[in-house]
């Protein structure tokens, strides 16, 4: 049983329909990721504001007696809210991978751009295909 090589279709309208379907599907995938990314961005903004407010509270504190108690006691007694924020941030970034979830549509678009470039195609950040002019190699 011989393996046949895959060829481009002879009919240009079939290739055009395939490109339209690919563009539609890519746009759907990137659009579907949008609301999830927005929710994670809002969570990160709330977390950053919370850390900023709590951190500024301790920077504004002018007490020098911080160095007179052990670090563990300081973080578990006087800075408990900052310690909790630190562990929530660690949970968000290390366990849930929020940073990857936020930039997921950008990663998908960039990888599609890389895969489409040999075919003189590209795509924008929304998944719309862009046809680039074909590169002509001039023989010397």
UniProtKB/Swiss-Prot annotation:
Disruption phenotype: RNAi-mediated knockdown results in the formation of two nuclei in each daughter cell following the first embryonic division. Keywords: Cytoplasm, Lipid metabolism, Membrane, Nucleus, Transmembrane, Transmembrane helix. GO terms for biological process: lipid metabolic process; positive regulation of triglyceride biosynthetic process; regulation of nuclear division. The keyword Aminoacyl-tRNA synthetase does not apply. Pfam families: Tmemb_18A. InterPro entries: NEP1-R1. The chain crosses the membrane at residues 42-62, 78-98. One of its GO terms (cellular component) is Nem1-Spo7 phosphatase complex. It is found in: Nucleus membrane; Cytoplasm. It is a multi-pass membrane protein. Its main location: nucleus. One of its GO terms (molecular function) is protein phosphatase regulator activity. Belongs to the CNEP1R1 family. May form with the serine/threonine protein phosphatase scpl-2 an active complex dephosphorylating and activating lipin-like phosphatases. Lipins are phosphatidate phosphatases that catalyze the conversion of phosphatidic acid to diacylglycerol and control the metabolism of fatty acids at different levels. May play a role in nuclear membrane dynamics being crucial for early development of the embryo. This is Nuclear envelope phosphatase-regulatory subunit 1 homolog. The lineage of its organism: Eukaryota, Metazoa, Ecdysozoa, Nematoda, Chromadorea.
């Amino acid at each position: 049983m011989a393996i046949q090589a895959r060829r481009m279709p002879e009919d240009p309208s079939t290739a055009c329909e395939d490109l339209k379907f690919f563009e539609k599907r890519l746009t759907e995938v990137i659009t579907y990721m949008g609301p999830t990314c927005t929710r994670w961005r809002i969570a990160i903004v709330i977390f950053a504001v919370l850390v900023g407010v709590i951190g500024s509270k301790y920077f504004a504190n002018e007490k020098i007696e911080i160095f007179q108690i052990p670090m563990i006691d300081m973080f578990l007694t006087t800075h408990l809210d900052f310690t909790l924020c630190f562990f929530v941030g660690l949970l968000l970034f290390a366990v849930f991978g929020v940073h990857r979830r936020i930039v997921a549509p950008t990663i998908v678009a960039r990888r599609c751009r890389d895969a489409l470039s040999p075919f003189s195609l590209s795509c924008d950040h929304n998944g719309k295909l862009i046809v680039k002019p074909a590169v002509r190699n001039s023989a010397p």
